[in-house]
Amino acid sequence: MKILVTGSAGRVGSFVARQLLGEGHRVRGFDLKPSGINSPEFDEVVGDFDDAAAAQRASNGVDAVLHLGAFMSWLPADRDRLYRANVDGTRIVLEAAAAAKVGRFVFASSGEVYPENKPEFQPVTEDHPARPLSPYGVTKLLGEELVKFQGRVSPMETVILRFSHTQNASELLDPTSFFSGPRFFLHPKIRQQEGFGNALAVEKLKALDIGEEALVLTRNENGRPFRMHITDTRDMAKGILLALTHAKAVGGIFNLGATEPVDFADILPAMAKKTGLPLVAVDLPGAGVWYHTSNARIRETLGFEPEWPITRMLDEAVSAWTRRQT
């Protein structure tokens, strides 16, 4: 097959593109910047998803589309860009794919459509009401509706995957990581909360600053440690490829992520023990993050089996962290 991978310069898209090439497929990338992938079986279109001409060039001659690219932000200043990339862009890529008579279109949505961090019940299944509370979540839900519409009015097969939070294992202990830095490390978390304008959180965090980098165990205002899903990129790629090829995926909506959530009360002490970094704990205002999302449907329907639980990811993260210290 020849497969279009949007977001081919990103974490998941670049990994999936390389994996497809390794399996003997031809791949076309489509992203705002070059992917850096070098293969005779790879070509790419550099441009915006909402550029109809670029989307058509990207879609022509491919058998399937993995629409993994998106713009992610929670900043009010980015809302116009969010809607252009994630709603207009998805519509335009869908229409280009349908015009090119693409066989299957796989769309990367998000747990933000529920949203996972404020669930009405747990574990969160695909039947949970979709009532997003962030502009990003709204754009992904609108994208889902566009995909379902195209599936109704054209012969193109469609699949929707609601992504878990995704990371490379090597990022877990990297304080410069966009996600893991402020999630697990004190100084990046202080900078994040300053950017959000959360003065009370900043005050509490700065009171813990010992002058050197430390890990931080975040709890809610009642002392409950955070809990969330963190899924390895390799497991996400495995689920994406099942959505691309499995007959039972057609027309489906699937949560894609790790089977078990990560309890910060367990993982942070383990990180501290394996690295020797100091560990501090903080209770921040609000209910905090505490959720469990079910992946039962994709396991039972498509045979998805994650292979990289957080403990295995952490072992790899420690190796990467050790290399950075030398």
Residue ranges and their predicted role:
Residues 3-23:
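N-terminal Rossmann NAD(P)H-binding glycine-rich loop of SDR-like oxidoreductase domains
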Residues 36, 47-85:
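NAD(P)H-binding glycine-rich loop region in Rossmannoid oxidoreductase-like domains
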Residues 65, 77-105:
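NAD(P)-cofactor binding segment of oxidoreductase domains
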Residues 84, 119-160, 181-184:
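Catalytic helix-loop patch of NAD(P)-dependent Rossmann-fold dehydrogenases
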Residues 92-135:
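Conserved Rossmann-fold NAD(P)-dependent oxidoreductase catalytic core, especially the SDR/UDP-sugar
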Residues 149-228, 233-235:
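NAD(P)-dependent short-chain dehydrogenase/reductase
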Residues 227, 235-285:
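Mid/C-terminal beta-alpha module of Rossmann-like enzyme folds, strongest
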Residues 310-326:
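Amphipathic terminal alpha-helices
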